[in-house]
Structure formats: C-alpha cells, structure tokens
C-alpha cells in the first residue's frame, strides 16, 4: 500500500510539473502572438502611403463631381 501511495504521489508531482510547464508554454505562446500582432500592426501603419496635404481633397468631393460643377 505504501509503495502504491508513493507512486501515486510521484505521479501527482510529475503531472503537476507537466501542467505547470504546459501553462508556461501556453502563456509564452499567447505573449508571442500578441507581440507578433503588435509588430504586424506597426508595419502596416508604417507602410501606408499618405499623400501630402496639398494633394488631398479638402472635402469628400470626387473628380467627377468637380467636373460636373464646371
């Protein structure tokens, strides 16, 4: 009986260690995924090409609207 209890407690300790390791790996994965998406967002916003203010339309008027007015 003592041998069985000893094996059971060893098994529980190993299972606990395994679960702690899995939790750590899951947290690491989530952390890496968050960092990846932050970097991806930064890259996307950095690569957006914006025209200088002088070339931007001042209102939502399109080219055809301005031609129709002329």
UniProtKB/Swiss-Prot annotation:
Residues 51-61 have a biased composition (Polar residues). Residues 40-70 are annotated as: Disordered. This is Uncharacterized protein X.
């Amino acid at each position: 009986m003592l041998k069985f209890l000893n094996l059971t407690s060893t098994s529980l300790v190993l299972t606990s260690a395994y679960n702690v390791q899995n939790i750590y790996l899951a947290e690491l994965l989530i952390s890496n995924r968050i960092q990846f998406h932050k970097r991806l967002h930064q890259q996307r916003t950095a690569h957006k090409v914006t025209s200088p203010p002088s070339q931007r339309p001042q209102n939502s008027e399109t080219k055809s609207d301005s031609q129709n007015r002329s």
